[in-house]
Amino acid sequence: MRRVAVVRFPGSNCDADTLRAAEAAGCDAYYVWHRATDLAQADVVILPGGFSYGDYLRSGAIARFSPVMGAVVAHAQAGGPVLGICNGFQILCEAGLLPGGLMRNAGLRFLSRPVWVRVETADTPFTHLYTPGETLELPIAHGDGRYVAEPRVAADLEARGQVVLRYVRENPNGSLHDIAGVANAGRNVVGIMPHPERRVALVLGGADGARIFQSMEARNATHQTGDVRVGRDQHLRV
């Protein structure tokens, strides 16, 4: 059973949903307050969505300096899996663990609705139970979700297969290359703007996000990408 640390910052508001989704996938999930400096007991670290520090200055810009981030960086540099969801994605970019950044939506409005995304790579600890090319319906809820990067960085992401999720049918926020999620070069750090924890059971409107969390536990059991497959219709019990 993988131990999953869900980091809580002042202003986090998706931490409980994220912890419950990880538990339902079979993980041993627990909260870590932003003042903590030790993540030695964690196999996986998740930075959940919300409005850390009220999104003052810039989304994720202050959280990046929280004491816990030193441990998050160390965990990532040691090859440990790290997932940032929405505000967590913003924090990972601010911390330099992921390339690029997230800016104000092109329409200058907060968006809260389901969108469609395509899985671009299954070669991460969080997507290996999906099939590349598979489309998912997941909710978004952000005002600063427009992914940006320098042309050279964007070209490298595409060439190296580091784009994890891509918006399809529409680009809701003006993200460069329709990018909804990226990974670092080692593919152990992943940031996504959609909220998979809000789509882990049919009672929530769908289960397309369940395998994000199931992937974490399945990889622990097999230690090999692709050894375990979960059917499209399977979902977590909540």
Regions found by a protein language model. Give the residues of each.
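Beta-strand-turn-beta hairpins that frame and shape the catalytic cleft
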Residues: 1-2, 133-135, 184-189
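Active-site-proximal beta-strand elements of phosphoester/diester hydrolases
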Residues: 5-6, 137-141, 190-194
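Pocket-forming structural segment of enzyme catalytic cores
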Residues: 97-178
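A glycine-centered loop/beta-turn motif at secondary-structure junctions
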Residues: 179-204
